[in-house]
Amino acid sequence: MKNRIFLAGATGAIGRRLLPLLLNAGYEVTGMTRSQAKALEFRGRGMRIVVADVFDADAVMRALRDARPDIVIHQLTDLSALAGSASPTAAISRNARIRSEGTRNLVNAARAVGAQRMIAQSISWAYGPGPLPHVESDPLDVHAGEPRSITVGGINALENAVLNSPPLLGTILRYGQLYGPGTGVDAPRGAAPLHVDAAAYAALLAVQHEAHGIYDIAELDADVVTEKARCELEWRDNMRLPEDAVTHIAV
């Protein structure tokens, strides 16, 4: 019997690409979104969808109790706020709050309902100063000045919560800078680029390989070493989904 999976952020850029991968692999999936309108897209698509705000701890607890997942996948961010905000610092702060308070609510609920594992999205550009390329054991830039400190603080809180909440086994996927459908960026740019399909693929592989710990996930680049993901997860950065696989889930 395949594991039951609870996907927080099911209608986000990565979530939409991850859903067909999970469903085609035979997993029983419950997706969470805060948007009622987006939830309506998923009716009759082979999965359950629940509407809940990650900042509402009671709502998150109810959603996970109903789903009874074996694995929780945390793909929540607020990329739309970062892209369209007139106040970048406010948008960064909201994203950091998702990573700190939102993650805490998910972890608490996952432990309460007996989930065995949590796989969470992080970023690969939060490392502190030091020689390149970075590896997973390098420290985060916890002494950065603002506004970078807001982002790194959120990442630090997320990773600590996911990795240090026994008996929950935690996996951190430190994604590079996303591009591709739904990200608002068409082509690779910046340090450690990553196509959104390859990001989703890494999450699927983390489920299948029962991986735990930290993995850098990015295209071959001078900034981070991704050998661990390529060897342990058999991940590859050139994985791409056929578009009809995605439109079958959400049009």
Segments from the language model and where they lie:
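SDR active-site strand-loop-helix element
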Residues: 8, 32, 75-78, 118-124, ...
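NAD(P)H-binding glycine-rich loop region in Rossmannoid oxidoreductase-like domains
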Residues: 36-101
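Active-site Tyr-X1-5-Lys
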Residues: 143-170
